[in-house]
């Protein structure tokens, strides 16, 4: 029972870190990268679909992105979605592809994005702590029901604390790396 609770908590923490990586990956940096478009969606025949599934996204230069829709009919919808996104870019459409020039970030915008990255990191750490709290409650229930002794539960709680600390540290490192990437000129 204890091993099950610990395994389940670690699995959930692993998923939370994966979500944190994806969230931080969507924060725009000064360089062009296909990941910055992962959160942009359009209405594609009645279903909300990420543009990454509707077009190929290439980065031929450090500050240039080319988006080539698989269906020409979706060109304008994709262009509008990119323009209306929070990326702060202005796409240009030449009839078959969309070119996006990624402007240099201003100091003010960099600081804004660092705050955004830190906020996403903090949200991830809160998620990890909530997973830990639920697992601790489960361990307490196991002890209360007499399925495990006090010593076993105590060891499991220490193990859970170590696991939580490991994943919190991972999130902190991800945020630190993103911050360095953003502040790089």
Curated annotation (Swiss-Prot):
SUPFAM superfamilies: Ribosome recycling factor, RRF. Gene3D superfamilies: 3.30.1360.40, Ribosome-recycling factor. It is found in: Cytoplasm. The keyword Nucleotide-binding does not apply. GO terms for biological process: translational termination. GO terms for cellular component: cytoplasm. Keywords: Cytoplasm, Protein biosynthesis. Its main location: cytoplasm. One of its GO terms (molecular function) is ribosomal large subunit binding. The keyword Nucleotide-binding does not apply. Pfam families: RRF. InterPro entries: Ribosome_recyc_fac, Ribosome_recyc_fac_dom, RRF_sf. Responsible for the release of ribosomes from messenger RNA at the termination of protein biosynthesis. May increase the efficiency of translation by recycling ribosomes from one round of translation to another. PANTHER family: MITOCHONDRIAL RIBOSOME RECYCLING FACTOR PSEUDO 1, RIBOSOME RECYCLING FACTOR. Belongs to the RRF family. This is Ribosome-recycling factor. It comes from Rhodococcus erythropolis (strain PR4 / NBRC 100887). The lineage of its organism: Bacteria, Bacillati, Actinomycetota, Actinomycetes, Mycobacteriales. The gene is frr.
């Amino acid at each position: 029972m204890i091993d099950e609770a610990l395994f389940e908590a670690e699995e959930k923490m692993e998923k939370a870190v994966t979500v944190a990586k994806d969230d931080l990956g969507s924060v725009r940096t000064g360089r062009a990268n296909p990941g910055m478009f992962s959160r942009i969606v359009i209405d594609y025949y009645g279903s909300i679909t990420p543009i990454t599934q509707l077009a190929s996204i290439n980065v031929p230069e450090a500050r240039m992105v080319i988006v080539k829709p698989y269906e020409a009919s979706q060109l304008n919808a994709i262009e509008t979605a990119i323009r209306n996104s929070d990326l702060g870019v202005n796409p240009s459409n030449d009839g078959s592809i969309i070119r996006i020039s990624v402007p240099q970030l201003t100091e003010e915008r960099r600081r804004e994005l660092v705050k955004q990255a830190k906020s996403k990191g903090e949200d991830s750490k809160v998620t990890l702590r909530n997973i830990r709290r639920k697992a601790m409650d489960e361990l307490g229930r196991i002890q209360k029901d007499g399925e495990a002794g006090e010593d076993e539960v105590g060891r499991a709680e220490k193990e859970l604390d170590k696991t939580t600390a490991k994943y919190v540290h991972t999130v902190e490192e991800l945020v630190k790396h993103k911050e360095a990437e953003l502040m790089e000129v």
